[in-house]
Amino acid sequence: MKPLTRIFVFLLAATSIWSLLGEMYRLWPMRFFTLAVFLPACGALIALALYSRWRGDGRAGRIILIGAIAGFVAAVAYDIFRLPFVFSKSWGLAGLVPSLPLFKVFPQFGAMILGKADSNSLAVILVGWAYHFSNGITFGVMYAAMVNGQWRRRWPVAIVFAVGLELAMLFTPYPAVFGIRVTDTFVVVTLAAHLIFGVTMGRVCIGLEKGVAKC
């Protein structure tokens, strides 16, 4: 992709995490930004990918698609790694694995987006999880824009990007807003989870390169 296109794609994808950052820093309500900015940005990304396929050489569309798929798969791997910590007590692992409420923020995401005080309704929980995966997908697209399809040569960038995101979030109001105790255990586990996210994202992009090229 051309430099300006890469920047445009990166910024469109970044609107997912910006919706949360703006809420935390009291710049805008997450509900407003999600509806007015993030969802239209998603539409613009899809439109750009389709236009690239139908009117161009398809390169931009392939890069966006590979990044989105890899980001989703990486988010799944990230959550699978965290499952033993979330369910440590119920799975009888308390003596081996520390119990950490790593999933408790997702319903709160949903409550912010829907503008509801109750974070226990099914709609709130589903929207919260959907937002969580939207972050994974858009992080994948952001990474794709950064490396511009040079998946094999630059795949370590995925690790730096993923771990850097977590380190940056630790210095935002995120822990305070969601009542998270930032202990040594929490930091180690979340950094390890983001390391897995980065490795998975980078390697999945490499694996998808040939398959998506045929589409």
Model segments located where?
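N-terminal signal-anchor transmembrane alpha helix
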Residues: 63-90
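Hydrophobic cores of alpha-helical transmembrane segments in multi-pass inner/ER membrane proteins
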Residues: 39-52, 138-141, 193-208
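Individual transmembrane alpha-helix segments
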Residues: 116-135
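Transmembrane alpha-helices
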Residues: 1-58
